[in-house]
Amino acid sequence: MSKEAYKGTVRLTVAQAIIRFLSNQYTERDGVEHRLIAGAFGIFGHGNVAGIGQALLQNEIAPAEGENPMPYIMPRNEQGAVHAAAAFAKTTNRMQTWMTTASIGPGSLNMVTGAATATTNRLPVLIFPSDQFATRIPDPVLQQLEDPTSLDVTVNDAFRPVSRFFDRINRPEQLIPSLLNGMRVLTDPAETGAVTIALPQDVQAEAYDWPVEFFAKRVWHVRRPPAERAAIERAVAKIRAAKRPLIIAGGGTIYSEASEELRAFAAATGIPVADTQAGKGAINCDHPCSVGGVGSTGGDSGNHLADKADLIIGVGTRYSDFTTASKTQFKNPDVSFVNINITPFDAAKQSAEMVVADAREALVALTEELADYRVDESYTAEIAAEREAWAAKVEQCYHVGNAPLPAQTEVFGALNELMGDEDVVINAAGSMPGDLQALWQAKTPVQYHVEYAFSCMGYEVPAAMGVKLARPESEVVSIVGDGTYQMLPMELATVAQEGIKVIYVLLQNYGFASIGALSESRGSQRFGTKYRQRGTGSHLEDTDTIAGVDIAANARSWGIDVLEVQTIEEFKEAYKAAAASDRATMIHIETDLMGPNPPGSSWWDVAISEVSVLESTQRAYEDYQNDRKPQRHYL
C-alpha cells in the first residue's frame, strides 16, 4: 500500500515501532481498561542491545508525543523474567502482562521454559527472542546454532511447541500483522498463552516508514461469550437428574472473576464446591458448600464426595491428572460430567456435556434456570459432616508439634493465621503444593497463587516480583524450598535492586521431600533425593554428612534481609517483623524432611519398573498393579 493511502507515516526502527505500538495497547472487560503490556523485562546482549535495548532507552529518555512510558526492569536470568511476567498476568486475571527480551542463542533459549510454564497455565506473556541476521551475511554469528539441512532453522524454533503464537520477522513490514495477531492471542481467554515473536538482530535496527494509525490507542475487548441456550438446557437436565452433584472450580473461575456468581450458585442449589490448585479461593473456605481441594493432593472432604459423585460440574478446569487422581478419583460407575469452559478443548474432556462459555455468564444462566432446585437435605448434612471432619484434621496438621524440627505444615498454619485475606501466598513445586492444596484456607480469589500446571522449580522467587508489581498494596509471601531455591535464586538481586518489598519463607530440609517420598513409595529408596557429601559408598547414604548450602548467607549476598528462626513461635514473630519492614525479607527455618504430611486418600499414577532385581521395586510394582485397577476412561 502506498504512503498516500495512510494519513501519514513515521520513520522508526522495527524495535522502536514495537515499543511505541505496545505502549498504546489496552484491554477492556466489564468497562474497565488496563494497559496490556505494563512493562519490559530485558537482558541485553549483542542480539538486542542496539535494537530493543536502544528502543527502550529512547522511550525512557526521549519518548515521542503520544508514546506512553514502558517501564523497564533488568532481571538476572531470562527464565526468571518470563516467570515474573506470567505471575503478573495471573495476578491481574490475564488482563495485563509484561514483555521480555533476550539476546540470541542461550539467552533466548533460557526463556523457553518460562514460555512453557505460561502456556501450560493459560497465561499471557509476550516474548521477543533475538535471532540471527536476516541478511545471512554475518554467518554464523556469535551464539548461532547452524543447521546444515535448513538455513532458516534457528534455536528459536524451540519456542514453537510451547507458544500459542509464533512468528519471525524477516522484513519490517511483516511486523504489523504479526503484532496485531500477537495481541489477539494475548487477549483471547480461550487462546492465550505465550506469544513469541523472534527478531533477527539486524531487522530490529532496520528503519521503515510506518503508518501513524498503527500507533494509535487500541483497546482489545476481552470477550465474555454466553452459553448457547441448548447447552444450558442440557446441563440443567443433567443437574436435575443428579443425586450427588459436585462442582470442581478451576482457575478459569478466577480468571473470569466469577467467584461471586459461584458462591451464589452454590448457596442457591446446595451443590458442594471442590477446588483445584488454580481454583483455590474461587469460593471462600468458610462457605457452607466449600469442601476444599480435590484429587491426588486434595483433602478428605472433597475427595470423599468426589468418590461418590454421580455428576461432576467442572467450572474452568483443565482436569490435570492431579485433579482426577490419574482417572481414579470419580469412582461412581454412573458418574457423568458437565464442563463449563471457555475453551472447547477443555470443555470436551471426560466426555462431558459441553457448555462452551465464559464461566461467569454460564453460572448466571444456570442459577436462573435452577431457581427451584436444591440438593436433598441428607446430602447437605453429609457435606457439613465432611467439612467438619476435615477441618479438625487441618487443625491437627497445623499444630502437630513435630520435634525436634517443625513440620512444614506448622509453618503453613502460622502463615494462614497471620496473612490477610488480600495478601498472596506463592508456591509451585515440591511437597509444598500438595500440603497447601489440602490445608490452606483461602477466603478470597487473590490469596492463593500456586503454579501447578507446569510446576516449575524456580518459579517462586521471580513470581514474587511479578505478583508484587501487580498488587503493591498486598503482602506477597513466596514459600520456597531449598531444592527449588537452588534452581533459580538470582532474581533476589532484582528484587533488591528495584526495592520490591516481598517476603520469602525459605524451608530448608536438605533434600527433595516430595520426590523422596514418591521414590520411597515406588520402590526407589529415596535415591538421589537428599543433599549429602559423598562418602566411601557407591552411592550417597543417609550416614553421609549433610551437604547443604548456607542459603541465609546466600540470600544476604543478593541484598535481602534474612531472619533465621528455629521454632514456630519465633517464625510468627519474624513474620510480623518482615511485614512491618519496607525491605524484602527472607525468613529461614529448617523443617523435617520426613514430614509429617496431611493424610491422603487419593492416588497418583507414576509408572514403576515392571522388572527389577530390587525387592523394594518388586513390591512397589505389585502395589501399583492393584492401585491402577480403578483407572478408566470416562465415557
Task: Specify the residue positions occupied by each region the protein language model found.
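Phosphate/pyrophosphate-binding active-site segments
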Residues: 2, 6, 173, 211, ...
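N-terminal alpha/beta PP-like core and its mobile active-site loop of ThDP/TPP-dependent enzymes
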Residues: 2-374, 414, 418-421, 501-504, ...
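A generic structural signal for residues located within well-ordered alpha-helices
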Residues: 14, 154, 257, 407-410, ...
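Active-site diphosphate/adenylate-binding microenvironment
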Residues: 40-52, 387-462, 467
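Thiamine diphosphate
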Residues: 136-150, 347-348, 355-356, 363-364, ...
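Short, basic/glycine-rich phosphate-binding loops at helix/coil junctions
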Residues: 158-159, 209-215, 387-393, 552-555
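Short amphipathic alpha-helical interaction patches enriched in hydrophobic/aromatic residues
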Residues: 163-166, 394, 398, 562
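Glycine-rich beta-strand-to-loop/alpha-helix junction loops that act as flexible
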Residues: 249-251, 315, 429, 480-483
